[in-house]
């Protein structure tokens, strides 16, 4: 709990699209809401039957993450190492950053440093002049429903007979890299999968695709 409280009181920082908010003199005013994604589900009402029939999928809808921000036009020391500049130039640089990046990008902040999301920015921010030298706005990113562990970027080596456990309560869809030759059996929750390999194979569980770089399709070698 103390670590969480310390994170909530930090000077906010966003990282997205290969850059971070402090590069543009952007200050995150407060911790964003911890919005949770909605489960994909369908509710059917049947005449003459009490209640509803519920069909729930093992999938969730996109969610959003919004940041209240200030664009700081103060001194170099006050703005985190950014040279003093006019507010309109700050706004131009800031919006160029947002609009020049396409598609889902890694989004992280220092409020939840152990996690990152995949998010895109679809536009619509209004930056207003407030107190002459400040710009005020809200950034809203559309995010995939998952929160990814930063620790998950570090490869874990597993040898014959070893097991791995998912550290979360949610379904994991890892990227598996197998080196060797012959038939390899991978068991996930008791369900076996056989991969016939020569040298190596990559299995992307998220995209349900087996391949070798640069673009060799290896799905026929998975059973």
Give short role names for the model-derived ranges.
Residues 19-29, 116-122, 193-198:
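Short amphipathic beta-strand/extended segments with alternating polar/hydrophobic composition
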Residues 44, 52-82, 133-147:
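Oligomerization/assembly interface segments of phage tail-like spikes and tubes
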Residues 13, 18, 111-113, 190, ...:
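Residue-level detection of beta-strand-connecting loop/turn positions
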Residues 64-110:
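Long, hydrophobic/aromatic-enriched structural stretches that serve as scaffold segments
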Residues 1-45:
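Polar/acidic, low-complexity leader/linker segments enriched in S/T/G and N/D
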Residues 2, 136, 140, 144-145, ...:
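Intrinsic low-complexity, intrinsically disordered or marginally ordered coil/linker segments
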Residues 149-223:
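Intrinsically disordered, low-complexity segments enriched in serine, threonine, and glycine
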Residues 100-147:
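Short beta-strand and beta-hairpin "edge-sheet" elements
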């Amino acid at each position: 709990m103390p670590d969480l409280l310390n994170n909530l009181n930090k000077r906010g920082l966003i990282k997205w699209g290969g850059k971070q908010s402090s590069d543009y003199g952007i200050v995150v005013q407060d911790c964003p809401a911890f919005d949770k994604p909605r489960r994909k589900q369908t509710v059917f009402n049947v005449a003459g039957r009490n209640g509803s029939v519920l069909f729930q999928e093992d999938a969730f809808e996109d969610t959003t993450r919004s940041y209240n921000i200030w664009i700081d036009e103060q001194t170099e020391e006050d703005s985190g190492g950014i040279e003093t500049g006019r507010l309109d130039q700050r706004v131009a640089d800031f919006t160029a950053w947002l609009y020049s990046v396409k598609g889902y990008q890694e989004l992280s902040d220092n409020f939840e440093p152990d996690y990152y999301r995949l998010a895109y920015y679809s536009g619509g921010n209004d930056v207003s002049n407030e107190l002459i030298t400040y710009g005020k706005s809200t950034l809203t990113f559309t995010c995939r429903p998952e929160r990814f562990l930063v620790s998950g970027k570090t490869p874990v080596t597993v040898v014959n007979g070893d097991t791995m456990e998912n550290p979360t309560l949610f379904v994991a869809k890892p990227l598996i890299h197998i080196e060797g030759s012959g038939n390899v059996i991978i068991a996930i929750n008791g369900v076996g999968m056989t991969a016939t390999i020569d040298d190596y194979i990559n299995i992307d569980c998220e995209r349900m695709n087996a391949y070798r770089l640069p673009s060799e399709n290896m799905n026929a070698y998975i059973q």
